[in-house]
Amino acid sequence: MSSKKIVLTSSDGESFKVEEVVARKLQIVGHIIEDDCATNKIPIPNVTGEILAKVIEYCKKHVEDDDDVVETHESSTKGDKTVEEAKKKPDDVAVPESTEGDDEAEDKKEKLNEWDAKFMKDFDIKTIFDIILAANYLNVQGLFDLCSKTIADYIKDMTPEEVRELFNIENDFTPEEEEAIRNENAWTFEQDGKQQVPKP
């Protein structure tokens, strides 16, 4: 890892000293560094210290593990041969290359996915909303996707009314419009071959 440190300062004045390679995971910061606009402190105006700490924790873990996964995969593919090279000796039977490196990369990826799931379980839904806003602003795509999946899993069994309440969405349909929409999309409420049309 790079030894150069970058200080990120949150909207509420909290400062975090991080490795440059970690700071670059926040793409908005990466662009500042690439444009040589980075000073020893980079302000992050739309993110509180509490949320920035969580974003940095995610980025640190993914810098370490993403690098390990890439290195393992690259080392496992160095011995790969082209089809033409394999055909040069027609008397020899082509033996597939070892997939040990690929298996190791898969194991690391699986462990990283487990870490992601555990990381998200620590937060209530409001915190997840704050993190997804920060991930969007800072352009941390992996964290944004992880939060999106977590929210999708959270709301998948909710009724439309519960989702509206969670997201503070006002229902602008009349009862007649709601009924018409439910009837048009009745197939989406089928379970075990039986139609389950929820009541408004």
From Swiss-Prot:
Against InterPro entries, the record matches this protein to: SKP1 (IPR016897), SKP1-like (IPR001232), SKP1-like_dim_sf (IPR036296), SKP1/BTB/POZ_sf (IPR011333), Skp1_comp_dimer (IPR016072), Skp1_comp_POZ (IPR016073)
Identify the stretch(es) annotated as Interaction with the F-box domain of F-box proteins: 132-190
Biological role: Involved in ubiquitination and subsequent proteasomal degradation of target proteins. Together with CUL1, RBX1 and a F-box protein, it forms a SCF E3 ubiquitin ligase complex. The functional specificity of this complex depends on the type of F-box protein. In the SCF complex, it serves as an adapter that links the F-box protein to CUL1.
Q: Subunit composition?
A: Part of a SCF (SKP1-cullin-F-box) protein ligase complex. Interacts with CPR1/CPR30.
Q: Which GO terms describe its biological process?
A: auxin-activated signaling pathway; jasmonic acid mediated signaling pathway; protein ubiquitination; response to auxin; response to jasmonic acid; ubiquitin-dependent protein catabolic process
- Principal location: nucleus
Q: Where is the composition biased (Basic and acidic residues)?
A: 67-92
Q: What is this protein called?
A: SKP1-like protein 19
Pathway of this protein?
Protein modification; protein ubiquitination
Q: Tell me its family.
A: Belongs to the SKP1 family.
Q: In which tissues is it expressed?
A: Expressed in leaves and flowers.
Keywords assigned: Nucleus, Ubl conjugation pathway
| Cellular compartments annotated | Nucleus
Pfam families on file:
Skp1, Skp1_POZ
Tell me which GO cellular component terms the UniProt record holds: nucleus; SCF ubiquitin ligase complex
The UniProt annotation puts the region (Disordered) at 67-109
